Amino acid sequence: MQRILVGFDGSEGSEQALNRAMMLIYEYGELFLLAVIPSPKDKSFVDANAYETMKKKACNLIDNVIKDLGEQSFKIKRLVEEGDPATVIIDTSSRLDVDLIVLGSKGQSELGQYLIGSVSNKVVQYAAKPVMVVR
């Protein structure tokens, strides 16, 4: 696989998805780590500070993972998008023309409420790209 998109929220499920994706990625390929946060228009945000805090947390989470992975034979890119997680994952996979989407089957983290569980089911149903759900 040359281009793999991993839905990542820091949960154990997303860590397992990342590990599986790393086994599948070709040398000199591209691995995209995508965190999806709610839109600031979402009712869960009382003020703009809460949105900015969550966005920074998502960026730091992925940056730390990339740092921990160290030098690889493939590129790793951070993506932080806002909106409905399943829709964002599906749209991003098409926009980036990835070969595979890899998601955890379940999990929970501070970002996890927006990424894991029913989201993977929706992505499997509606994505135009192949999807791997890791248990």
Residue ranges: model-predicted function:
Residues L103-Q125:
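Glycine-rich, Arg-bearing micro-motifs that act as flexible, cationic patches
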Residues D47-T53:
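Short glycine-enriched, charge-decorated loop/helix-capping segments at active-site entrances
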Residues Q2-V46:
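Small/aliphatic-rich secondary-structure junction motif
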Residues V131-R135:
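Short hydrophobic/aromatic patches at helix-to-coil boundaries
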Residues G70-I101:
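Structural beta-alpha unit
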Residues I25-E27, G70, A128:
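Short conserved AdoMet
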